[in-house]
């Protein structure tokens, strides 16, 4: 079971809690243990501030991933971590990239959840493994390959607080 804490700190429209839960549970289904995570939806100001604090980048990014650093034995339910999603950036990217907004949301949530599970895209081999899993999961939802039309970028700009 997934315990999802959805925090909405923006007035911008966003997917429903049920949609976020569906995308997270799909990405996390390989994990058999109960899990807890937070998704915080933010505006560009908060997104920029967090990106600056954790990555020293002075702009809002689409998703920041913060894997939990608390050993599971200290918790009732294992804490996976937090995703912080900047709604305006997600909307802008979907428009600029000609992608269906729901498909882009699903992709970024799945991508962020995979980061919480330890997946990364620092080198080509890791990126290929992560992207293949993203494609597979998105196809199950009926969404197209998010990388099909993008030969130059191998991964969304989802970042973890540890990656620089």
UniProtKB/Swiss-Prot annotation:
<keyword id="KW-0540">Nuclease</keyword>
<dbReference type="InterPro" id="IPR020549">
    <property type="entry name" value="YbeY_CS"/>
</dbReference>
<dbReference type="Pfam" id="PF02130">
    <property type="entry name" value="YbeY"/>
</dbReference>
<dbReference type="InterPro" id="IPR002036">
    <property type="entry name" value="YbeY"/>
</dbReference>
<protein>
    <recommendedName>
        <fullName>Endoribonuclease YbeY</fullName>
        <ecNumber>3.1.-.-</ecNumber>
    </recommendedName>
</protein>
<dbReference type="GO" id="GO:0004222">
    <property type="term" value="F:metalloendopeptidase activity"/>
</dbReference>
<keyword id="KW-0690">Ribosome biogenesis</keyword>
<feature type="binding site">
    <location>
        <position position="121"/>
    </location>
    <ligand>
        <name>Zn(2+)</name>
    </ligand>
</feature>
<feature type="region of interest" description="Disordered">
    <location>
        <begin position="142"/>
        <end position="164"/>
    </location>
</feature>
<dbReference type="GO" id="GO:0006364">
    <property type="term" value="P:rRNA processing"/>
</dbReference>
<keyword id="KW-0378">Hydrolase</keyword>
<keyword id="KW-0479">Metal-binding</keyword>
<dbReference type="InterPro" id="IPR023091">
    <property type="entry name" value="MetalPrtase_cat_dom_sf_prd"/>
</dbReference>
<feature type="binding site">
    <location>
        <position position="111"/>
    </location>
    <ligand>
        <name>Zn(2+)</name>
    </ligand>
</feature>
<dbReference type="GO" id="GO:0008270">
    <property type="term" value="F:zinc ion binding"/>
</dbReference>
<feature type="compositionally biased region" description="Polar residues">
    <location>
        <begin position="154"/>
        <end position="164"/>
    </location>
</feature>
<keyword id="KW-0963">Cytoplasm</keyword>
<keyword id="KW-0255">Endonuclease</keyword>
<dbReference type="GO" id="GO:0004521">
    <property type="term" value="F:RNA endonuclease activity"/>
</dbReference>
<comment type="similarity">
    <text>Belongs to the endoribonuclease YbeY family.</text>
</comment>
<feature type="binding site">
    <location>
        <position position="115"/>
    </location>
    <ligand>
        <name>Zn(2+)</name>
    </ligand>
</feature>
<comment type="function">
    <text>Single strand-specific metallo-endoribonuclease involved in late-stage 70S ribosome quality control and in maturation of the 3' terminus of the 16S rRNA.</text>
</comment>
<dbReference type="GO" id="GO:0005737">
    <property type="term" value="C:cytoplasm"/>
</dbReference>
<keyword id="KW-0862">Zinc</keyword>
<keyword id="KW-0698">rRNA processing</keyword>
């Amino acid at each position: 079971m997934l315990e999802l804490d959805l925090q909405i700190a923006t007035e911008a429209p966003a997917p429903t809690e049920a949609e976020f839960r569906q995308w997270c549970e799909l990405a996390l289904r390989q994990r058999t243990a109960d899990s807890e995570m937070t998704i915080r939806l933010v505006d560009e100001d908060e997104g920029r501030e967090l990106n600056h604090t954790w990555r020293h980048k002075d702009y809002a990014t689409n998703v920041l991933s913060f894997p939990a650093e608390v050993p599971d034995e200290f918790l009732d339910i294992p804490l996976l971590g937090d995703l912080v999603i900047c709604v305006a950036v997600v909307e802008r990217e979907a428009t600029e990239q000609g992608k269906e907004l729901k498909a882009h949301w699903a992709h970024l949530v799945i991508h962020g959840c995979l980061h919480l599970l330890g997946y990364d895209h620092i080198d080509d081999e890791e990126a290929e493994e992560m992207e293949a899993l993203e494609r597979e999961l998105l196809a199950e939802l009926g969404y197209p390959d998010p990388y099909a039309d993008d030969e130059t970028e191998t991964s969304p700009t989802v970042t973890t607080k540890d990656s620089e």
